[in-house]
């Protein structure tokens, strides 16, 4: 583990003693042949697209209520939810209805499944992490395609995976500690398209230069 995933003082939550690596508990190598990072879609479309590759098991009412608040605060924005679970019509309909119950028209939602994920991510401006259980590999895939995300740091360790990734990347400013702050940080990212375009253009290089993709360094840390 690492200090962001298992902060000092949380030892009582574990049955074993946490062994903290000095930089990151994660190291990433993209699978297959990822697409090149494209220009920010919102610059051409005129609206922000949020997106997540999470599985349905991570969705919950508290989480989608926060996402509904986010969509309400960013006019015209849309949400893409892409995972194999949502290839089932009954699962798609369940979550479409839950968003509608929160005041979000289904026309603003694209829930389904396409693979490989790289093409989906090329159409998204900002990635969404889940809580109280954070996403995992899909956060790294999103960053690799130039998409920033905000995480809500919760209970170690499944609630602090996003914080670990962002700390290793060098963007702790995208870590939130309350639901209000989570939404506020996402709104701030969505409200500055020139800055968001710069983030997208440089994020893959930042990631490649970080501990998240330093495989030899990770091996040395473990040794």
Where are the language model's segments positioned?
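Short, conserved active-site loop motifs that form the nucleotide-linked donor/cofactor pocket
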Residues: 18, 108-110, 172-173
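Conserved catalytic-core segment of nucleotide-activated headgroup transferases in glycan assembly
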Residues: 23-115, 122
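Acidic, amphipathic alpha-helical patches
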Residues: 116-117, 162
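Generic beta-strand/beta-sheet core signal
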Residues: 1-2, 53, 82-84, 112-114, ...
């Amino acid at each position: 583990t690492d200090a962001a995933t298992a902060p000092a003082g949380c030892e009582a939550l574990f049955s074993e003693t946490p062994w903290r690596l000095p930089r990151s508990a994660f190291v990433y190598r993209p699978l297959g042949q990822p697409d090149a990072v494209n220009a920010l879609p919102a610059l051409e479309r005129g609206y922000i697209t949020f997106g997540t590759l999470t599985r349905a098991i991570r969705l919950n009412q508290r989480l989608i209520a926060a996402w509904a608040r986010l969509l309400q605060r960013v006019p015209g924005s849309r949400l893409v939810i892409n995972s194999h679970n949502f290839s089932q019509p009954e699962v798609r309909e369940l979550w479409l209805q839950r968003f509608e119950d929160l005041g979000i028209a289904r026309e603003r939602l694209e829930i389904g499944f396409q693979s490989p994920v790289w093409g989906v991510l090329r159409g998204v401006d900002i990635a969404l992490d889940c809580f109280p259980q954070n996403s995992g590999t899909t956060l790294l895939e999103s960053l690799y395609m130039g998409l920033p995300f905000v995480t809500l740091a919760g209970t170690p360790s499944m609630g602090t995976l996003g914080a670990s990734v962002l700390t290793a990347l060098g963007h702790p400013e995208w870590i939130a500690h309350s639901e209000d702050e989570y939404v506020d940080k996402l709104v701030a990212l969505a409200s500055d398209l020139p800055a968001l375009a710069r983030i997208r253009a440089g994020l893959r290089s930042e990631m490649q230069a970080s501990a998240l993709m330093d495989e030899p360094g990770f091996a040395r840390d473990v040794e």
